[in-house]
Amino acid sequence: MKVLFRSDSSSQIGFGHIKRDLVLAKQYSDVSFACLPLEGSLIDEIPYPVYELDSESIYELINLIKEEKFELLIIDHYGISVDDEKLIKLETGVKILSFDDEIKPHHCDILLNVNAYAKASDYEGLVPFKCEVRCGFSYALIREEFYQEAKENREKKYDFFICMGGTDIKNLSLQIASELPKTKIISIATSSSNPNLKKLQKFAKLHNNIRLFIDHENIAKLMNESNKLIISASSLVNEALLLKANFKAICYVKNQESTATWLAKKGYEVEYKY
């Protein structure tokens, strides 16, 4: 089956969509991606053919599907609406798998919500009658190193681990770290695409209790070596749940609200930073 992922990444959007798509992509043998070449994107790190799009036009995507005869379109993109999905289906007949994080209407054959809070009943009346709904933690897309790390009982090197995603455009990592006691050893994980990286590096230099990890190869191990995690209410939550870690989730964008609400109801520590 020829599979096309439609997804983007950038220093503004972050890396979460592409990262989880790459985990799902391993389930298929013939995979390609269609992405806009945005600033700070992960296009060069995608180990599959990438079609660089010229625009957000749905017709450009439709033409690509027709020309390359893709059989399954996987949409992981907040900018593609239910009406766009209807148009794609009408024009191409392609099978559609749609990611969803906000309990929104979709016109798809398979609906995938990988967040722990999600239930199939949430989508009654929101998706076509014959749509296959895949929801909840059992469908979580978690990298293999987390499953391996969940078996390890590591010595705790760090009092706190902070990660606000790969880009952390609001520079929350620095803000959170500066509010913690200076007697505590704090690890901060980020990426070289973080627009606030220089500020973080300067902060780490001035504080000998801070350990800054940039593009670290094994985030799972870092998390497992920490007494408490302070993480965004994103896919990091599924990873923390798998590790059975002590964590606090920070909600700072709208698409994290459902996860944050569910965590709070379950008794987990949640903080909102808008």
Swiss-Prot record:
Catalysed conversion reaction: UDP-2,4-diacetamido-2,4,6-trideoxy-beta-L-altrose + H2O = 2,4-diacetamido-2,4,6-trideoxy-beta-L-altrose + UDP + H(+)
One term of GO molecular function: hydrolase activity
Record key words, sorted: Hydrolase
Domain of life: Bacteria
Residues annotated for substrate binding in this entry: 15-16, 143, 234-235, 239
Active-site residues, as the UniProt record annotates them: 17 (proton acceptor)
Similarity annotation: Belongs to the PseG family.
Function: Nucleotide sugar hydrolase that catalyzes the fourth step in the biosynthesis of pseudaminic acid, a sialic-acid-like sugar that is used to modify flagellin.
The name this protein goes by in its record: UDP-2,4-diacetamido-2,4,6-trideoxy-beta-L-altropyranose hydrolase
Record lineage: Bacteria, Pseudomonadati, Campylobacterota, Epsilonproteobacteria, Campylobacterales
